[in-house]
Structures are given as structure tokens and as C-alpha cells.
Regions:
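Intrinsically disordered, low-complexity, mixed-charge
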Residues: 1-90
């Protein structure tokens, strides 16, 4: 299992980014969470196989059709998750 923390920049709020990421994560078997941040970014903790995490990171670089992602920062993450949830804004 691999766990990564993503910080997604660009036009990523108000474009259904979080719900779209939850759907894609469920399709890939990725667990964790995604939330808006007050600074306008989206933050996500993703966990799964190397292949699944690589796939959700690739998706995160594009997001849903209305999004315009300019950068995705990636760090090692922590935690143990059973599902993928949309979390409250932080």
C-alpha cells in the first residue's frame, strides 16, 4: 500500500472536483479523503496500490472537465483508510 498527500492548485473549487475525485477513487479502489482548503486549493490523501495511486495522481492533474489544474504537489502521506470520503473544508 502507498499513501500520498496531494495539494492541487488552479481552478479546482466550484467545478465538482471533490465529487469527481471520489467517483474516480472508488473506480480505482483508492481510499482516503479529499477536501477544499480556504486558500482555494484542494487537498487529498490517497491510499492504494502503486498502480491505483499513480492513476489517481494522473487523474488529479486534469480533474473534471470544468477544472483547470496548474500544479499538483505530492508528498508521502499517513493514515489507514477504509473508504474515500469528501471531508469538510480546512
Amino acid at each position: 500500500m502507498v499513501t500520498k498527500l496531494l495539494l492541487i492548485h488552479g481552478r479546482v473549487q466550484g467545478v465538482a472536483y471533490r465529487d469527481s475525485m471520489r467517483i474516480r477513487a472508488d473506480e480505482l479502489g483508492v481510499t482516503g479523503w479529499v477536501r477544499n482548503r480556504r486558500d482555494g486549493t484542494v487537498e487529498a490523501m490517497v491510499q492504494g496500490t502503486h498502480e491505483a495511486v499513480d492513476a489517481i495522481i494522473a487523474w488529479a492533474n486534469w480533474g473534471p472537465p470544468a477544472a483547470k489544474v496548474t500544479k499538483v504537489e505530492i508528498e508521502d502521506g499517513i493514515g489507514d483508510f477504509q473508504s474515500f470520503d469528501v471531508a469538510p473544508t480546512a
